[in-house]
Amino acid sequence: VEANLYTTEGDIDLKPADRECFDIILAGFHKAALAKNPKDWWLFYVCPMWQDRFGYTKQAIQRNTDAYVKAIKSGHCDVITHLNYGMKTDVKQVAQAAKDYGVCLELNGKRVSMTDEEVMTIVDVGAPIIVNSDAHSKDRVGDVSVPMSVVERLGIDKNIIVNWEKLPRFGRRAAR
């Protein structure tokens, strides 16, 4: 299941009792999700609309980064989805936390929302990378052509993709 990162504290909108029902939990920022409270609504939804247009402050990037790092450290998710889509982060810091905690960073099947340099930062840090179709229709299930074109264009070794021709073992389940 894909949950929403919906607070600056790194909370996801999946109840603790429900987490055990899912084999894999993906988490990411989604523009249409509801925030947990008015402060997070302002910081997560209103501010990014302006920042996408006029630029992100260092403070905003760090706040967003901290939210992702807290989500990773919480142990409540296996994969961070479409990093930097709708909310700019410091990719190196997020990648380091992902590596340290065994959380995969997704290259998304609709769009890779990071620059080539940011994707290579993830590779250089050694964070686990997963490709995902992000299918919103049955015809797109398993279509990883978008992320794999980035992998091929950047010369990334396919063997570092945790779900390339093999089933990954996710950190949250491995810890059980």
Predicted segments, located by residue:
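Active-site catalytic microenvironments in core metabolic enzymes, especially phosphate/sugar-handling
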Residues: E2-N4, V123, V146-M148
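Extended substrate/RNA-proximal surfaces in nucleic-acid metabolism proteins
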Residues: V1-D100, E152, I160, R172-R176
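Residue-level detector of anion-binding/catalytic polar loops
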Residues: C104, P128, D157
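His/Asp/Glu-enriched short active-site or ligand-binding loop at hydrolase and phosphoryl-transfer sites
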Residues: G102-R111
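C-terminal helical cap(s) of enzyme catalytic domains, especially alpha/beta-barrels
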Residues: V144-G155
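Short acidic/histidine-rich active-site segments
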Residues: A127-G142
